[in-house]
Amino acid sequence: MKALLDLFKQVTAEEEFDAITIGLASPDKIRSWSYGEVKKPETINYRTFKPERDGLFCAKIFGPIKDYECLCGKYKRLKHRGVICEKCGVEVTLAKVRRDRMGHIELASPTAHIWFLKSLPSRLGMVLDMTLRDIERVLYFEAYVVTDPGMVSNLQRAQLLTEDQYLEMVEEHGDEFQALMGAEGIRELLRNLELDSEVESLHAELEVTGSEAKNKKLAKRLKILEGFQKSGIKPDWMILEVLPVLPPDLRPLVPLDGGRFATSDLNDLYRRVINRNNRLKRLLELKAPEIIVRNEKRMLQESVDSLLDNGRRGKAMTGANKRPLKSLADMIKGKGGRFRQNLLGKRVDYSGRSVIVVGPQLKLHQCGLPKLMALELFKPFIFHKLEVLGYATTIKQAKKMVEGQEPVVWDILEDVIREHPVMLNRAPTLHRLGIQAFEPTLIEGKAIQLHPLVCAAFNADFDGDQMAVHVPLSLEAQMEARTLMLASNNVLSPANGQPIIVPSQDIVLGLYYATREKINGKGEGMYFADTAEIERAMAAGQLDVHSRISVRLKQYEPAAVDGEWEEKTVRVETTAGRALLAKILPKGLPFKAIDRALKKKEISKLIDESFRRCGLKETVIFADKLMQNGYALATRAGISFCSDDMLVPAKKYEIISSAEAEVKEIETQYTNGLVTQGERYNKVVDIWGRTGDQVAKVMMEELGHEEVIDRHGKKVKQDSFNSIYMMADSGARGSAAQIRQLAGMRGLMAKPDGSIIETPITTNFREGLNVLQYFISTHGARKGLADTALKTANSGYLTRRLVDVTQDLVITEDDCGTKNGFVVKALVEGGEVIEALRERILGRVTVDDLIDPETQETVIFAGTMLDEDLVDLIDKLGIDEVKVRTPLTCDTRYGLCAQCYGRDLGRGTMVNAGEAVGVIAAQSIGEPGTQLTMRTFHVGGAASRAAVADKVEGKSAGTVRYTSNMRYVTSAKGEKVVISRSGEVLIVDDHGRERERHKVPYGAMLSVDEDKSVKAGAKLATWDPHTRPIITEYAGTVRFENVEEGVTVAKQVDDVTGLSTLVVIDHKRGGKAAVKGVRPVVKLLDESGQEVRVHGSDHTVSIAFQVGSIISVVDGQQVGVGDVLARMPQESAKTRDITGGLPRVAELFEARTPKDASVLAEVTGTISFGKDTKGKQRLVITDLEGNVHEFLISKDKHVLVHDGQVVNKGEKIVEGEPDPHDILRLQGIEALARYITDEVQDVYRLQGVKINDKHIEVIVRQMLRRVTIVEPGDTKFIKSEQVERAELLAENDRANAEGKIPATIEHMLLGITKASLSTDSFISAASFQETTRVLTEAAIMGKRDELRGLKENVIVGRLIPAGTGLAFHRSRKAQLAGEDIAASRQIEEATAENTTQEADQGL
């Protein structure tokens, strides 16, 4: 009996492990795994269906086919366990050993492993320092390789010889030297490789070499050789002498009916290898001619190649039906491979799926579960209960009862599911709210009922969506589901900390309708004692729900003494509907919170307010009541609409005709040659865009207001009760833009390529479209549908990359103790506060004490988390910048600390240790991805708005200031013309605090003087939006140089107008090739005919024209200061489509260098222009020490600086998108983080999506997690190696402790794909992308995966180190160390540092 118990123990004993290493297997290792050699290609006997002996399914090698039964049937049953049958040689044991017993094939000739040969860069090539082409020639028997030159002087090791050269050498030198062909040759070379001496010589070479390319090559080779050294793997193991054979149950052969077999492709591939191997053995025994043997060896090499990775070299081997066979490599890579299909995504038991329907009667924490589903899902629980209660004696009997659906079973089912939460999931699960737990209530029917308020989180609707149910089984699982996942515990969205349980659609409409006010409604001005009286009056038909009345309401205020609620009765003047709603307000929310027309935004604020003031429980109850009331009220209101509700404004037609007149006027200007084709198009589009908005405005005026007569007989305006208007105004359905299409004018349409068609649709859907208008409409609409399909896939891929890069980021400690942080200000653009300071710092932890600017005393201490009240205080004190902690400056080695992260947005409290903040960040950014557009349409979007700004107006009153880089000249007319590119106008208040700032472009006219006070709405500057002028800062007579027709300028005659203009052309297209590097310039002469010089220098003034500019002056003309010399039509800059939406976000996170990247100043210094070379202009910056830095910039780029300007390091000097890598290099991490955060937020803000900055910062932290070694000092690194930040810090700590020189580094920015692939964990990287490459590299280096991230742990099937798993692993490690759990923290921290040290000393 004891033996039996031991058996069960041995099966279930699970090994605890903390890391996994991967390496190359030596031939002996492979033989030691094997249970016997597979000698024959046969599989099973087609008559007896028994496996052939020594074949691919041989029972002697791999184990019995039936449990405890040998093949010939001599031994059966358990009592013979472990006996080996003497007749058939099969061991009597469990049949499942066929899943893990391996065999082997002894190869008659060694074979190279294709992964190490062909996966780029070729590892074999790097180790031997030979090219891949050469190695292949040797392997596939086209050339000999010298393995031992012996005494022959003109031969080197690893030199290639052709057949003829070899024969010549043999004739000459006989057997003094050795040269081999095929894998044997390569194996010899690898065997003779002296690793230690090679590594030393490489180190020596690295010291002396100068060239960058050589350096890189040597470093790569050194890294591989050191990898072999460290891991103790011999290089010649990359050549296979023994091939392992996969256990047969992992490559099954299944008989189908009709005598055919379904087989795994691997069996075919193995059969080919065995056939060729056996043939080769026979040929060798027969001493066949060399050429035949060679051919056979080559074929063997090819068949082994296809077995390992089919199609990697040459044509893929195909089966009978012409499709490529699936090799071992294909089994593990890609979406259907082992990693993503079986390890990261598994199907689970105890789950079901069904269609969802709405369940408005449910409480927030409930869902309706069909009885039949529940019966099936909770079967084991029911069986148990039936036994315990004595209804059934055996499980079998219980099963019968359940299947027969006896009445008692239903009572027990009710009992079992009480308080047992189930998890509901709707695919695609884009963020953590896509799986939530509910308490099931049993319902008839077959559809799952879902609470309406959680639809937003699941992104569910009831048009046929399906959802899956999962049952948490263990008590711990139930507890976690209940405390963490219950729908009522997830009121806030983890992406932005705002409520996600928000009423929408009908509920909003009902609440809005009930809280609207109607002038002179029935019963207006009545007085009521309490709400019950109101209800009676309404039931009697004496009172309208919208009427203004007075009523006594109970209000609750916290008592001064004990903080209990005190009840007060106050008389309030309000509407009947609002008074009735007051009944459901939780204590702690004042009545004024609902004393207004409740729109969707207001209701969201209301729930937020309730959460902050009254806590979670009250809020959930309140939300449920709001929902029930909203539905009831919407039903009672009976709002519907018809075509008469779409009121077309009478003024529409005159607005349109005036616009048509304007367009005609511009057409006339165009025919007279005053504007160019491009300007005309821009202006026309602007006019129609404006007109559309005007019509919409007039329409909303008419639709949204109605005149009524009040009690005193006066005419007054009030918000209209038009159904369409109410739906849009409340935020229930529809928007102003949609109403505009119904009753205004449809406006401008876009073509599929995003450009705007200049003829707008002047009619609306109410009036109907004609054929042309309908056709123009379909144009853009179809594009929208095509985009949606692409968008979903792209968005999913972005999310996958984001999750992969951040999956191992977990909160691991409370405080890392850093004193660093970022200074945060309000985000201001174009004078508008886009994001207030309070929103950006809410939930962050302060770095410094905050001081009241008035009294200079500390109001908030360092290390405080800023909650709503503190943020209000900061607002009140007028503090305009705060230094806060951020994930980017956190000093925690593996993971993040709670203080740097701040508030957990989904819970509203400080983040807990073990929270997987990385994954949450990735989900928060990825989830709204589907809402982002693929390409930005410029219709009514921000793009078309920004293009036509032609003035700046102050929003607030104050004093005008200019920034230091604002330069202007005063023209003869007294106008101040701006000649700086990046000047800004500020308005400051009386305390000198900046209220707003506006960028002023080059060539603008300033309308205000510095230090003058202005009123709100004052015009600050104006400019022409459609052209960019070139302005002179000096007066004089114009003299053209290099202005030659057909060479540098072209006369352009407009077909329509017949007028000619001089346009600067690219001289490359001019006829003469002799005049390279000349550009048209204007020199200015003074009265005496001398060239005018730049003030304070002897440079002459020369103003160069850019390609494409239209010259406005003629030779010899007198010009004054601030005059325009030429203008550059703006449309040329406008045609470059702004990358928007999803592709823009992906581009930022992938850290791609933009197409037309701008150039940033490398140093702080003074600008000058050097000699031009062909097609390039030379820009020179002289820094403060007098060192010169040159940039070559192509002529068509727009330079933002001018001669003599002083620029700061990192400032833009050429127009374009900045390259994030440059920002990091020149301005550091903070500037980079700010750039990426702002740019990503711009895209999301355009779509109205809110995401907290810290999520983006978390991703940027992961993009910065690797560093480049600049000087290795006394560390183990080599120069320009890339290493993980944590590894570097540990190594530097060690160097410092030993008093050695630590390494110096520079930060590097990796795109998210690169960052995921370069993670320390090879398991995580392999399951992401490029599986082959990752695994080959890891195997050679003998890498060790510490299983720190979440993904690795899911793959190996352990509890993930996040949440409760973090505590579990910590306590487990502490117990292993023989310590009590209290000491586990010190151990955890110490081990993180020690592991790297031990690894180093162990070498």
From Swiss-Prot:
**Membrane-traversing stretches:** none
Check the record and name the InterPro entries matching this protein. DNA-dir_RpoC_beta_prime (IPR045867), DNA-dir_RpoC_beta_prime_bact (IPR012754), RNA_pol_asu (IPR000722), RNA_pol_N (IPR006592), RNA_pol_Rpb1_1 (IPR007080), RNA_pol_Rpb1_3 (IPR007066), RNA_pol_Rpb1_3_sf (IPR042102), RNA_pol_Rpb1_4 (IPR007083)
Q: State which Enzyme Commission number(s) the record gives.
A: 2.7.7.6
Give the binding site residues for Zn(2+) 1: C70, C72, C85, C88
Against Gene3D superfamilies, the record matches this protein to: 1.10.132.30, 1.10.150.390, 1.10.1790.20, 1.10.40.90, 2.40.40.20, 2.40.50.100, RNA polymerase II, clamp domain, RNA polymerase Rpb1, domain 3
Function according to Swiss-Prot or TrEMBL: DNA-dependent RNA polymerase catalyzes the transcription of DNA into RNA using the four ribonucleoside triphosphates as substrates.
Q: What does the entry comment about cofactor binding?
A: Binds 1 Mg(2+) ion per subunit.
* Catalytic activity as recorded in UniProt: RNA(n) + a ribonucleoside 5'-triphosphate = RNA(n+1) + diphosphate
Name it: DNA-directed RNA polymerase subunit beta'
Q: Which GO terms describe its molecular function?
A: DNA binding; DNA-directed RNA polymerase activity; magnesium ion binding; zinc ion binding
Q: Which SUPFAM superfamilies match?
A: beta and beta-prime subunits of DNA dependent RNA-polymerase
Residues that, per the record, bind Mg(2+): D461, D463, D465
- UniProt-annotated binding residues for Zn(2+) 2: C816, C890, C897, C900
Per UniProt, subunit arrangement is: The RNAP catalytic core consists of 2 alpha, 1 beta, 1 beta' and 1 omega subunit. When a sigma factor is associated with the core the holoenzyme is formed, which can initiate transcription.
* Family label: Belongs to the RNA polymerase beta' chain family.
Identify the GO cellular component terms for this protein. DNA-directed RNA polymerase complex
Superkingdom, taxonomy of origin: Bacteria
The cofactor named in the record is:
Mg(2+); Zn(2+)
- Disulphide connectivity of cysteines: none
Q: Which GO biological-process labels does this protein carry? A: DNA-templated transcription
Instruction: Name the UniProt key words of this record, in alphabetical order.
Output: DNA-directed RNA polymerase, Magnesium, Metal-binding, Nucleotidyltransferase, Transcription, Transferase, Zinc
